[in-house]
Amino acid sequence: RAAPIARRTAQAARAAADEFDAEGWYELGLELEAVEPGEARDAYRRALELDAHHADAHVNLGRLLHEQGLVEEAERHYRLALREDPDHATAAFNLGIALEDLDQPADAIEAYRAALATDPRLADAHYNVARLYERIGKKAAALRHLSIYRRLVG
């Protein structure tokens, strides 16, 4: 039911795209994500052509690329977002996931820790870092983060 509304909104926005600034392209990307992820990626790329410093466009483009299996490219966009906004918890969290997918657990732990330094209530970051600590044999750290995770979700 929402998809046709989102499509109509996106079609109307595309018709006015010549007038868009970076934020307009970013907003169009948000509208398109649910119905046309490929077009959403294009909209985020256009936003970044107009404003290479748009951290949220980097994060969202990175997430869509990651979902497409382009993990290295996603990692690059998450890092660019963090360069623009070092306290972007979502960028740091998503970077952690990408680094896990690239089998870089130590770097993933650092990314999750950066996300938690910005937002200690990110339950999923606590869970993911607990799993990684368990994997590398740091049982006490794993238990500490698992306990925090349970407190946050329980």
Give the residues covered by each predicted segment.
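Long, contiguous interaction/recruitment modules in multidomain scaffold/adaptor proteins
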Residues: 1-23
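Mixed-charge (acidic/basic) macromolecular-recognition segments
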Residues: 20-31, 35
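Conserved alpha-helical positions within TPR/SEL1-like repeat arrays
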Residues: 26-30, 56-66, 90-97, 124-131
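Structural signature of tandem alpha-helical TPR/SEL1-like repeats
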Residues: 33-46, 67-80, 87, 101-114, ...
